[in-house]
Regions:
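Surface-exposed amphipathic alpha-helical tracts and adjacent flexible/coil segments at the periphery
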Residues: 1-253
């Protein structure tokens, strides 16, 4: 599009723009939606089936994504591959040397995603579109139960019991006119969020968390360790003029 190739790092980002869908008679069928926005292709749960089908390499989508996204997704897929290799050592082995340990526990719902789809993997058409927002809405955490006058203090009704908010979390919601808006939680305590005044907030709006500040810090702080096995041999021999020592070392790579 426009002489730019996404495969060469010059994506025009057409999927993030909003469009009207008009028929041949000029009738507007869909107005102001991200019509080209698709959910993210995710076959995390099908890796073993794909490996059995002969796939030997898996591509992680990382174009225009931030570092925490790449770390999170790569770690998630890597653990899945490790589990398959450890369970079926006679069938599979890692293509790279060494072993990775430690680090954070990945959770792909907590970094950028526009929802997930498996597309045609089973030969059936699924739900692909993410037309309401080309951005990452995040995970739904609840709805607005109360607002102060200038809409800078929000009381939430959570959808679950184990939701914990953190100072600095990012939130999104759909405005009354169907647009996606967002804000940062400067102070989050229990079910209360304090933020800069956000006029488009309203009672009953569903609230999504698209930046989990605690998880972002965990990714940044807890790095994984890659270890490569090394074999060392040291020997000593007694000769006429005294002891002679030799040493050699080799790594698995």
């Amino acid at each position: 599009i426009a002489g730019r190739s996404a495969n060469r790092g010059a994506c025009i980002q057409a999927c993030r723009s909003r469009y009207d869908l008009v028929d041949q008679d000029g009738k507007v069928l869909v107005k102001d939606k991200a019509l080209l926005s698709l959910k993210d292709y995710n076959l995390r749960g099908r890796i073993e089936e794909l490996a059995d089908a002969g796939i030997t390499s898996f591509k992680i989508e990382g174009r225009l994504k931030n570092e925490s996204y790449v770390r999170n997704v790569v770690r998630d897929y890597s653990l899945a591959l490790d589990e398959i290799v450890s369970r079926r050592p006679s069938d599979y082995e890692r293509g790279s040397f060494g072993s990775v340990s430690g680090g954070f526990t990945p959770d792909t719902s907590k970094t950028f995603n526009r929802g997930y789809t498996e597309l045609f993997i089973d030969g059936r058409r699924g739900r692909w579109a993410s037309m309401d927002a080309a951005k990452s809405m995040g995970e739904e955490i609840g709805s607005i139960a109360s607002l102060n006058r200038d809409k800078s203090e929000i009381g939430l009704k959570f959808t679950g019991k184990d939701i914990v908010l953190n100072n600095g979390d990012g939130f999104s919601f759909v405005t009354k006119d169907g647009k996606v808006a967002g804000f940062r939680g400067d102070v989050c305590q229990g079910k209360t969020i304090r933020c800069k005044s956000t006029p488009s907030l309203f009672i009953g709006a569903k609230i999504y968390r698209n930046i989990n500040a605690a998880f972002e810090k965990e990714i940044e702080r807890k790095n994984c360790t890659r270890e490569i096995r090394v074999k060392a041999v040291i020997s000593f021999t007694m000769q006429e003029d005294g002891w002679k020592g030799t040493a050699s070392a080799s790594s698995e790579d």
